[in-house]
Swiss-Prot record:
Protein name: Protein translocase subunit SecA
EC numbers for this chain: 7.4.2.8
Compartment list: Cell inner membrane; Cytoplasm
One family name in Pfam for this protein: SecA_DEAD
Organism: Helicobacter hepaticus (strain ATCC 51449 / 3B1)
Entry superkingdom: Bacteria
Name of the coding gene: secA
Record keywords: ATP-binding, Cell inner membrane, Cell membrane, Cytoplasm, Membrane, Metal-binding, Nucleotide-binding, Protein transport, Translocase, Translocation, Transport, Zinc
Binding positions for Zn(2+) per the UniProt entry: 828, 830, 839-840
Family: Belongs to the SecA family.
Length: 851
């Protein structure tokens, strides 16, 4: 009842929006006769006038929307030979209003984007169009560039092939930038690791339009973007844990929970593992690493399946994106799982990595002042878009009514029977000449179908992650007569399948789904490949009780029906009731995934506030006009207080109890200072003396430099310590996040505990930052030829920072690049001529987070 009321309300809300937009469409159409009589030069001049009005602040985007849309449509007609339909104008307005335009396949989403892009690009603040892969970013930018150029805009493209920072800088400087979600996100993280404001490439986050918005903001939202560096850990444990895991047996030694993707050892399994590892207690503190490696090895061997979750290519394990079926090059599983899979597959094991910078897609895209998106399937996740991103979904009517027939699911008892039925259907369609597109849920299943079709001598084409480079050509030809195409998940393909009149007579493209995906949206995308622009088409799913969705989440109702009917081999059941039961199983999984994404976001929101504060400070430090004098002075006072506290000298204590010898030794060790007579001084006098002496020593040293050199050294050292401390803080936060779930056993909310602990860790990080910067600045040694030494030192520091930045590998692991360690008796790299141990190596052991 409640659901009906909600759907009625939502339906009416959508209808109201469409009615409102239709009035706007009439106003845009009324201008068409005005603009189609203008010459090209006059049309360009009319658009240029709008640009001047906006940039001079004389009008708003909303007030010139009708003119901008009408001019863009006229320009598109002349330059691209394509005129925007009325429904496309509605889509453009939804995008401009910061909404998600749900438009069916073949409705021309790529062209719709031009309307909102051109209007918002008039501000001169940059518009980012985000796509799911490099192919689509290149294709869309190049196809639409003539239109944008005609209207006076420059277009930039950001893909994984653009490695040079100068090229990226030029691309981002353009009015309109096309690129992938990963590249935009990583550029943001890399920008916040740069040591010069002029090297930052991305600029401001004004307006973004996300193509295939559900794929990026929903499917990929569980995967954070991570820039990482190596952690030196021994690799033998992975091989040992793998051999132990392979000797343990399912059900006898452990149980598998497929729903939650967890493997639990039983008593027998623990005893066997302890015997194989030759340890007394697998779960003691000293064996914590072994138990962790065993957990990951069990997952690698019994939960992660080759050619479904990953492929082995060129002696490397490459992840397969479960939603798009594409290879996720450069991405790695975290927490040692990737290494466990490498051990299982007997390929080179790469080192584990430590997070240097990270952000989730949710928090990256929420940086934009205005955000919108387009997709063929968004209504099933409308509530999530609204809750997480504050994005409303508008279903745009189709230009021509959809003619496709969506038949009920056919359910078989076993997978073998299901595949035989699919082959029979393909044979029937192939003889008729009707093209068929077969969707599979994994590479493994597409290979099974491939072998069966070869056996029956039916010519066909396979599109899965292994052939992703040829996907556009394969999909384009899927609508020709007699074509049989097998494809893993069709999400985000972005290529239309066009058919001719002969195929229309045969009934159009026939879609066969061999398994229901965990998300209804992916199934709808597969169905949506047929019936574009009013073409005929048919879609039907073939399922079996052995499919993972039905096995893990399916209700007993379906199994009960099958048993009562007493079906013989090869027979199936087909009814609306069964189809609805399958959809209810999908809803269960979607809710699970939603909770998982929400959970990830709740945790990342905590880190996000800290990230914003650190990046804000970093940007202030990068500003050459930033003066650190006051900050350094305050930090010096706090450091002096910290030194007294470490020596157990506290305010209000009697001076006869002060351990002055301990204080002197500590100050000499940490700051390289000799302090004079401190006997009989009270706390305040002692603190004042220490601050004065630190200040005198510092000013005496720095006064030999020019003001600009001094400021630059202070800024670079501050940045160096900030980055080092932030890396350590992220590492500590990672460790905290890994174990925080266990607090639930103590009747405590893990999220509340995480917030408390991370806040305390952040306070510790801030204190350490202040102490370490003061210490570093105090121990800098400047000798003769001050200017030359200072310049050399600045250059050395900058070179080291740049080298560190270049050594970082994007995402989760890569072969580490090791820097040579400076021996204690080597000359100090600062150029002082002293040995390292008595110059910059003198600072003593690091403490706290920097240990």
């Amino acid at each position: 009842m409640l659901q009906t009321l909600i759907s009625k309300f939502l339906g009416s809300r959508n209808n109201k929006l469409i009615k409102h937009y239709l009035k706007e469409v009439q106003a845009i159409n009324a201008l068409e006769s005005t603009y189609n009589t203008l010459s090209d030069a006059q049309l360009q001049e009319a658009f240029m006038q709008l640009r001047k009005l906006i940039q001079n602040g004389e009008t708003s985007l909303q007030s010139i929307l009708h003119k901008s849309f009408a001019i863009t449509r006229e320009a598109s007609k002349r330059v691209l030979g394509m005129r925007h339909f009325d429904v496309q104008l509605i889509g453009g307005m939804a995008l401009n209003d910061g909404r998600i335009a749900e438009m069916k396949t073949g409705e021309g989403k790529t062209l719709v984007a031009t309307l909102a892009v051109c209007l918002n690009a008039l501000c001169g603040r940059g518009v980012h169009v985000v796509t799911v892969n490099d192919y689509l970013a290149n294709r869309d930018a190049k196809e639409l560039e003539p239109l944008y150029n005609f209207l006076g805009f420059e277009v930039g493209i950001i893909t994984s092939e653009v490695r040079d920072d100068n090229e990226r800088l030029q691309a981002y400087a353009c009015d309109i930038v096309y690129g992938t979600n990963n590249e935009f996100g990583f550029d943001y993280l890399r920008d916040n690791m740069k040591y010069d404001l002029s090297q930052k490439v991305q600029g401001e986050h004004y307006f973004a339009i996300i193509d295939e918005v559900d794929s990026i903001l929903i499917d990929e939202a569980r995967t954070p973007l991570i820039i990482s560096g190596p952690v030196n850990r021994t690799l033998e444990h992975y091989q040992l844990a793998n051999s132990v895991a392979q000797r343990l047996k399912n059900e006898e030694d452990f149980s598998i929970d497929e729903k939650n993707r967890v493997i639990l050892l039983n008593e027998e399994g623990i005893k066997k593992a302890e015997s194989l590892f030759k340890v007394d207690n697998l779960y003691s503190i000293e064996n914590a690493a072994l138990s962790h490696h065993l957990d990951q090895a069990l997952k690698a061997n019994y939960l992660f399946i080759k050619d479904k979750d990953y492929v082995v290519q060129n002696d490397e394990v490459v992840i397969v994106d479960e939603f798009t079926g594409r290879l996720s090059e450069g991405r790695r599983f975290s927490e040692g799982l990737h290494q466990a899979i490498e051990a299982k597959e007997k390929v080179d094991i790469k080192e584990e990595s430590q997070t240097l910078a990270d952000i989730t897609f949710q928090n990256y895209f929420r940086l934009y002042e205005k955000l919108s998106g387009m997709t063929g399937t968004a209504q099933t996740e409308a509530s999530e878009f609204l809750q997480i991103y504050n994005l409303e979904v508008v279903s745009i009517p189709t230009n021509v009514p959809v003619q496709r027939k969506d038949l009920n699911d056919l359910i078989y008892k076993s997978e073998k029977e299901k595949f035989n039925a699919v082959i029979d259907k393909i044979q029937e369609l192939y003889k008729k000449g009707q093209p068929v597109l077969v969707g599979t849920a994994s590479i493994e299943k597409s290979e099974i179908l491939h072998e069966l079709l070869k056996k029956h001598r039916i010519p066909h084409t396979v599109l899965n992650a292994k052939q992703h480079t040829k996907e556009a050509e394969i999909i384009k030809d899927a609508g020709v007569k007699g074509a049989v195409t097998i494809a893993t998940n069709m999400a985000g393909r972005g290529v239309d399948i066009k058919i001719n009149d002969e195929i229309r007579e045969l009934g159009g493209l026939y879609i066969i789904g061999t398994e229901r995906h965990e998300s209804r949206r992916i199934d709808n995308q597969l169905r949506g490949r047929a019936g574009r622009q009013g073409d005929p088409g048919i879609s039907q799913f073939y399922l079996s009780l052995e499919d993972s969705l039905l096995r893990i989440f399916g209700s007993d109702k379906i199994k009960g029906i099958m048993e009562r009917l007493g079906l013989k081999e090869g027979e199936h059941i087909e009814s609306g009731l069964v189809t609805r039961s399958v959809e209810s199983a999908q809803k269960k999984v979607e809710n699970l995934h939603f909770e998982s994404r929400k959970h990830l976001l709740e945790y990342d929101d905590v880190a996000n506030e800290q990230r914003k504060a650190v990046y804000k400070l970093r940007n202030e430090l990068l500003d050459e006009n930033c003066s650190l004098q006051e900050r350094i002075s305050t930090n010096r006072e706090l450091t002096a207080q910290s030194m007294l506290y470490k020596a157990q000298i506290l305010p209000g204590d009697d001076s006869s109890n002060f351990n002055i010898d301990s204080l002197k030794a500590q100050i000499n060790e940490e700051l390289g200072l000799e302090i004079g007579n401190c006997e009989n001084l009270d706390y305040d006098e002692l603190l004042e003396k220490l601050i004065t002496q630190m200040n005198t020593a510092y000013e005496e040293k720095m006064s030999k430099l020019e003001e600009s050199q001094r400021a630059q050294i202070e800024r670079i050292i501050y940045l160096q310590v900030l980055d080092s401390s932030w890396r350590e803080h992220l590492y500590t936060m990672d460790n905290l996040k890994t174990g925080i779930g266990l607090r639930g056993y103590n009747q405590k909310d893990p999220l509340v505990e995480y917030k408390k602990e991370s806040y305390n860790l952040f306070l510790e990080f801030v204190e350490n930052l202040k102490f370490e910067t003061t210490k570093m600045l105090q121990i800098i040694q400047l000798r003769d030829k001050e200017e030359e030494v200072a310049n050399k030192m600045i250059k050395n520091l900058q070179d080291e920072l740049e080298e560190n930045l270049q050594d970082l590998n994007t995402n989760m692991d890569s072969t580490p690049v090791r820097k040579n360690k400076i021996a204690r008796n080597d000359p100090c790299p600062c150029g002082s001529g002293k040995k390292y141990k008595v110059c910059h190596g003198k600072s003593g052991p690091k403490s706290g987070l920097l240990a």
